[in-house]
Amino acid sequence: MNKPKTDYAGYACCVICGLIVGIIFTATLLKVVERKLVHTPSIDKTIKDAYIREDCPTDWISYNNKCIHLSTDRKTWEEGRNTCKALNPNSDLIKIETPNELSFLRSLRRGYWVGESEILNQTTPYNFIAKNATKNGNIFVAQRILPNCIRVTLYNNYTTFLSYHYFG
């Protein structure tokens, strides 16, 4: 008695087609998520509503007598700092001095590089920034990357520490 032949080529074709569709779907989903992280309506509205001073360079925004440049580029702390200085020789990564500045920056970015580390306890690698800025459960965490370098991130039940982040 002859066994019916199994069409392995047909199965293989279906599996390959399924894998291709899955890869395309995943790649598309990752692009959508990345765009939402970089270009969110709240960021765009905040930037448009920000006061532009004449003494700030073109495309920079003003807050609390500081000119701020926002970038969508992902860079290391050192690359971000070098880019700041290349944009304007007198510029550097921002120094957060008040809870209001922290709140303003939070409305612009979820994470960013800053240029000062004095707000951290020098003996521990992690510390909360501006404890009176933690109202409504919004806690920002700083991670010491280098002796004079910290990265600020929103703590939302978990925090992912990366070596690259947006700089501002």
Curated annotation (Swiss-Prot):
It comes from the Viruses. It comes from Vaccinia virus (strain Copenhagen) (VACV). Gene3D superfamilies: Mannose-Binding Protein A, subunit A. It is a single-pass type II membrane protein. Its main location: host cell. SMART domains: CLECT. Residues 63-168 form the C-type lectin domain. GO terms for cellular component: host cell membrane; membrane. The chain crosses the membrane at residues 10-30. This is Protein A40.
